[in-house]
């Protein structure tokens, strides 16, 4: 941008000088007109202020048709180079009404060019922006003029495309606001200040917007602040333009010189192929190189190193073959060994050759990555730059040669992957089967341990322990100390019953401790089926529970004396029976009972 146009007043002065009366035939000063359009496009001045400055100059020059024609020509230059923000102001009612008034005039000898120019500007704006809702007022003006019978120029078949490109001028983007940098996302603070990129309009921190570049395509000729992304794009375009310039210089060389170089290169290739034909009996095809104008500076050093390495390998192979042939000629008496030696060498070299075929070298991998990067960078380049880039074509040929090996390596990798997947599935199945077998084995071990443990009989009358000798003091003495023999008293009315019950009770009290003691011994346990007589005797005689606790001994004695409680007491009058109190918890008789019966009740 011109440094003189910094204010609206400076813009007005520049507009007056660009449309000066001293310029004949309504022409304008093109340099000043471009400065005005750059000032409008660079957004240094407001779009509305710029529009009003142009309108002011148009209204001032009504009396002079040549000056007014120059003013409208300056308006046309600014409209086509001012950017979208300026087009919105030009297509507003404030400016379009003035243009409609001029276009609606009848053509005369003096104003024919002026009226034709205004009509053409309106028609171009209508054709380009008739579907734009923000610039809809242009369509209204066009319809009103058509209703008045104004004739507009006829549109050619490709006129719409050309018109759209005519108003497509790049302008600085609108500034956006944010609380953090759009690259590093660091929040803005008092120290970390925000800066706007003059190219893309984004907001960035000082670290990512420290570059300064002029933006002539946006009307900014002095260096301004740009972000890192815009700076990288500028550098890429700069390097690509240099490469295109070198290529154009090479194409500008004399045609005879290029043909001489092609002939020399073709002659050298033919000589090298003739030498290789005499050695290896190979007949390669010779093709004419179309892009042979590449200079030594453009050759890839990595490619040259790879070619030299392949030539050295070929030479070593020829030397080995020559040595083998000389050894075979020197020892003709050993034909079998001479025949077996190449086969052994071939068998050793077969895996190496297969490995070389299925794998890529580091140089080939670098070539593939370099080719991919170049293709990615040349997406935005024109088609001529892609076709004329010799380095890209050389890399394409080299990468194309590695395609079979890439496919072979990819298939091999897929095969290995599928094999590993199958092996993983088999291992999973085997592990599940092994876990099942292990659980079954552990379950069998637990069951066998449970079945091997001795169990006491649940029915004491079904099995009988082997009795120990009755003379053993360990079975009789402890019970005699802890369980004294109970004494039973006879009564007058039930002496016979007591006499019958006493032997059974004594037998039960003597045999129960022995049986209880024998039931505790685990070793030597041999269950036997008891005899029917013993079973009937045991069932008919009352028995005590095994090893009764001390607190339950009185209850057991009561159970043993149950037959005594069946003594028939004499009947007494019913009206003298009384209920016992809660403290006694039993029924008592009236005072008419005898002292002997009271004593008997107390003993019970």
Curated annotation (Swiss-Prot):
Cite the record's Polar residues compositional bias ranges. 507-523, 581-597
Q: State where it is primarily located.
A: membrane
Sites binding Zn(2+) 2 sit at 197, 200, 227, 230
ZnF (FYVE-type) ranges: 175-235
Q: Where is the UIM domain?
A: 260-279, 298-317
Keywords from UniProt, A to Z, are:
Endosome, Membrane, Metal-binding, Repeat, Zinc, Zinc-finger
- Gene Ontology cellular component list: endosome membrane; ESCRT-0 complex; vacuolar membrane
Topological category with respect to the lipid bilayer = Peripheral membrane protein
Q: Which SMART domains match?
A: FYVE, UIM, VHS
Q: Where is the composition biased (Low complexity)?
A: 488-499
Show the segment(s) annotated as Disordered: 241-263, 314-335, 465-604
Bias (Basic residues)? 241-253
Q: Name one GO biological process term.
A: microlipophagy
Query: Where are stretches of biased composition, namely Basic and acidic residues?
Result: 254-263
Assembly and binders: Component of the ESCRT-0 complex composed of HSE1 and VPS27.
Domain annotation text?
The FYVE domain is involved in the binding to phosphatidylinositol 3-phosphate (PtdIns(3)P) which is required for the association to endosomal membranes.
Protein name stated in the entry: Vacuolar protein sorting-associated protein 27
- Which gene is annotated as encoding this protein in its UniProt record? VPS27
